From Swiss-Prot:
Chain positions recorded as substrate binding sites: H19, K23, T45, G46, T47, T48, S65, G66, H98
GO biological process: methylglyoxal biosynthetic process
Family, per entry: Belongs to the methylglyoxal synthase family.
Disulphide bridges, residue numbers: none
Domain of life: Bacteria
Protein name, as recorded: Methylglyoxal synthase
Gene name tied to this protein: mgsA
Residues annotated as catalytic: D71 (proton donor/acceptor)
Species, as recorded: Vibrio atlanticus (strain LGP32)
Length: 151
């Protein structure tokens, strides 16, 4: 597939997602990183967004709940270039009813080459990177070329 680039802005669009057993862990991480997070635009699946907003006072645009389609809503935003990075504390030891949606969300994040943290250590690495508050050019699929090849 041919590639093109897009520029992530200085103020990133960050998706925050957590499975039920990991919501307390994400909440703790968000509280620890609140000062950095408030410089960015935050999105979340419904239940996670409601919890984080209520407990931290951060402005978060919440989708609907993940199992009801929120994972897919975030995936659509990623494919439109409207999400720059994702912090997704998922539960690798317990199946969830919407496992196919979870896999699709992680797949689409990989397709569109956005940074994804699936645990606290990786989230800390991302948030301690100087790139967090800089414009960053990333390679992404050239959808126009892809379309031209297929039609």
């Amino acid at each position: 597939m041919q590639k093109t680039t897009r520029t992530m802005p200085t103020h990133k669009n960050i998706a925050l997602v957590a499975h039920d057993h990991f919501k307390p862990e994400l909440l703790r991480w968000v509280k620890e990183n609140k000062e950095k997070l408030q410089k960015h635009f935050l999105y979340a699946t419904g239940t996670t967004g409601s919890l984080l907003s209520k407990e931290t006072g951060l402005a978060i645009k919440s989708m609907i709940s993940g199992p009801m389609g929120g994972d897919q809503q975030l995936g659509a935003l990623i494919s439109e270039g409207k999400i720059d990075m994702m912090i997704f504390f998922w539960d690798p030891l317990n199946a969830v009813p919407h496992d196919p949606d979870v896999k699709a969300l992680l797949r689409i994040a990989s397709v569109w080459n956005i940074p994804v943290a699936t645990n606290r250590a990786t989230a800390n690495f991302l948030f301690n990177s100087s790139l967090l508050e800089e414009e960053v050019i990333i390679e992404i699929p050239d959808y126009e070329a892809y379309l031209a090849e297929r039609t």
